[in-house]
Design a protein with these regions (language model features):
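ATP-dependent helicase/translocase motor core
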Residues: 1-65, 70-214
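Short, basic, low-complexity termini and linkers enriched in Ser/Thr/Gly/Pro
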Residues: 216-226
Length: 226
């Protein structure tokens, strides 16, 4: 069967079985829901296609994993490279490739600030997808009250605008640093990447969660363009 049928008849039921979109706070973002990782770009003469993940699994306000789907007649290994690419772009630790019959799980590992692996990357075949709670525990083994508060606070979507993937990564990275009590944070973004919008969303989440009821000093959220 083709990929659309494979997803509808084989992959979707496997996700529902373990609680996705059944457990409160769990969301499956798909191409049909217009989940676009990166918009298309004009490159010389031709226009490149936008990058769209087949599935992005979100729970408690955070994107936790990507699933690259292939039709059931194709070997599951053909989706692995794309699954890894999307995981790197979205900064999710876990990613999967599936043809509906088999599921290949990839743990992208954890790196320190210098890019050295703290937890090595691993791959293996699994019999099912993790539940929302399991995937959350895999991603965040230790509880962290402020991180969870920041995650659960929705972005300000006045005007119907959503953060692009790199803006969301920047917002989450800054808020993780705040949650970990890092005293000074420097956010460096290139010209034209939405520095003001990104800084606004950071401040929005800080104020809405009550992290600082007085004010956020600009020195604590240094935003510099390159």
């Amino acid at each position: 069967m083709d990929e659309t049928a494979t997803r509808r008849l084989k992959i979707d039921p496997k996700l529902y079985e373990v609680g996705w979109e059944q457990v409160p706070g769990s969301v499956i973002l798909t191409e049909q829901r217009a989940y676009e990782i990166a918009p298309g770009r004009v490159e010389r003469i031709k226009h490149s296609k936008p990058k769209k993940a087949d599935y992005v699994l979100e729970y408690q306000g955070r994107k936790l994993a990507v699933i690259e789907a292939k039709r059931d007649e194709v070997d599951v290994s053909e989706g692995v490279d794309q699954a890894k690419q999307y995981a790197e772009m979205l900064q999710t630790r876990f990613t999967y490739a599936s043809n509906g019959d088999r599921i290949w799980a990839i743990d992208m590992g954890v790196k320190d600030a210098k890019g050295n692996y703290i937890i090595p990357s691993t791959e293996k075949e699994v019999t099912r997808f993790p539940s929302p709670q399991e995937l959350w525990q895999m991603t965040y083994p230790e509880a962290h009250p402020w991180r969870d508060k920041f995650n659960l606070q929705p972005f300000n979507r006045d005007g119907g605008r959503n953060p692009r993937y790199y803006q969301e990564n920047a917002i989450n990275n800054v808020l993780n640093a705040v949650a970990n009590k890092q005293e000074r944070i420097l956010l460096t973004m290139a010209t034209g990447t939405g520095k003001t919008y990104t800084a606004f969303q950071i401040c929005w989440k800080l104020f809405q969660t009550g992290w600082n009821k007085d004010r956020v000093r600009s020195e604590e959220l240094g935003v510099r363009s390159e």
